[in-house]
Amino acid sequence: MNYNKAMPNIDKTPRFSILILNWRSEQHLPGCLNALQAQSFKDFEILLLDNGGQEAIPNTLIDEYPDLQLSLTRSEKNLGFAQGNNLIAKQARGEYLVLLNADAFLEPNWLSIIQDATLAYPEHFFASRLLKANEPEKIDGEWHVYHVSGLAWRHMHNQPQSQATNESKEVFGACAAAAVYPRVAFEAVGGFDEDFFAYMEDIDLDFRLQLAGYPCLYVPEAIAYHVGSASSAPRSDFAVFHGHRNLPWVFIKNMPGLLFWCLAPFHVMVNLAYLIMAPFMGKGKVMARAKWASLKGLGDAFKKRWRIQKDRKASVGDIAKLLNWNPFAPLIKRKF
């Protein structure tokens, strides 16, 4: 069900469609919307999904923000991050999709800076600097790093802001807590893979966009403050299950050509290492369930791989340059 507010110039295509999925993070939503209301660049719409049938967001919320072009959709079931964002992305009219967590708060010039970046780099998608909302002197993440082993992480996570990367550069991908995608690119690659439900789905999207010929640009001046883990604890059974079930699927679907066959043994070893270590961290059962579920999905993953690689535009060399090859990086990964 949709609750829409009539706005002036509703037929005008907005520059940005901002997609916000709410799942147990409604306490942060006013701060998120207040930050959007304060944006210096105003050409955007907001599509908000109240996910999971909790009706945590009152219908009156729309009336509390008369200056925002805001649409509220409700889902009776928890669709997960992937399917939930795909649902509201289909309603979007903007030229660019902004994926924004409900617990992420943009600085007032964030959209203005991103607008300038889209004009200068129209074929790119964009990563922005995330700082910890409760410790703004620390970095929550700058961009996604993808290692040759198949592991992935946020660059500079938990490092002091004084060590932040201050130059714009092409990177592997963007953390979808505050990321920007050309709508045509998002649609061209099919949006998020809904089989993922949550965790690793934005890294999978990064990879597919890169393979399709859409590079990612890190824009350090665009700063957002991110609470993080507002909807699920980072080491919860839910997070461990989905993250480790989805880990091999990303690798199998996306790693191109010769790189796949050269790196697959290392990826297998990484998965076996997690199975061995998990019992010592109290996660043995959930890790075993995750890897078994991943194995059961390998057939579908290879079918998707065939379709993705058939349409690949980026060369194997292009992708190789985006990967992290440092053998020690997974051990001290935050700075790599």
Feature names for model-found ranges:
Residues 97:
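Short aromatic/hydrophobic "clamp" motif used to bind/position activated sugar donors
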Residues 75-92, 102:
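Glycine-rich, basic loop-to-helix element that forms the pyrophosphate-binding segment
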Residues 172-223:
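A short, conserved alpha-helix in the catalytic core of glycosyltransferases
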Residues 34-43:
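Short, acidic, metal-binding catalytic loop of nucleotide-sugar glycosyltransferases
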